[in-house]
Each structure stands twice: as structure tokens, then as C-alpha cells.
From Swiss-Prot:
Family statement: Belongs to the histone H3 family.
Species this protein is from: Dermasterias imbricata (Leather sea star)
Residues covered by region (Disordered): 1-43
Cellular localisation: Nucleus; Chromosome
PROSITE patterns assigned to the protein according to its UniProt record, in alphabetical order: HISTONE_H3_1 (PS00322), HISTONE_H3_2 (PS00959)
Name under which the protein is recorded: Histone H3, embryonic
Principal location class: nucleus
SMART domains attached to this UniProt entry: H3 (SM00428)
Keyword Phosphoprotein annotated: yes
Amino acid sequence: MARTKQTARKSTGGKAPRKQLATKAARKSAPATGGVKKPHRYRPGTVALREIRRYQKSTELLIRKLPFQRLVREIAQDFKTELRFQSSAVMALQEASEAYLVGLFEDTNLCAIHAKRVTIMPKDIQLARRIRGERA
């Protein structure tokens, strides 16, 4: 049978809306009263942007003090055993380390944006360090 072209027709009158069945009505009202409520979720990226604003406003250190101190002591053991640190020296190292990392991530983000991406990748960090002259 050959296909025929269908044309739009204006409806005349039509049927009255049917009443809902009892089971359908019960199904629609059940989640509102006794069902388990789904936990609220923000859209992807909303929480990330909120965290960016929060951390850009603040000045506190982001790496926990004790894990950083253990890392410093572990690295220092390679050079000399039985080395002791003043607490102010560890704090100065942590301030400098975090400042370096923040700057590196800023440059890394610029490299990702230059590549028309929003996600940073290891190659962006490598490029940023190479441009800075830290690693050939």
C-alpha cells in the first residue's frame, strides 16, 4: 500500500476527559506522603564553584599540619638523620609549599583554558612547569 500525505485537521469537540482510575491516583499521591524522600543534589559544578569562592576568600592553610610535618621529616631523613625542626620552620615550609602549589595550579588552569578545556590534566602541569623553567 502506498504512503499518503497526512494533513493537519482541526479537532471538533472531542471527548470529555476521563476520570483517573483508583490505582493511578493512589500511585501518584503515595510518594508525597509516605515515600522515602530523595536527598537534595546540586547540579554538577555548583558545589565546585562554591568551594572555589570559599577557598579564594580564606587565608587559612589547606594542608593539615601533622601530615605535612610527617612529610617534611620523611624527606629530611634522606639528607640527615636526627634532624630537628622548630615549629615556625615547619609553618614557613608549609606556607611556601601552599603558595607554590596555588600558583602552579593557576598556571595549569590557564594552560587547560588555552587548550580549550576546563579540566586540568597532567600535561597542563608539565607545560606550566616547563614554561616557568622549572623542568626542561
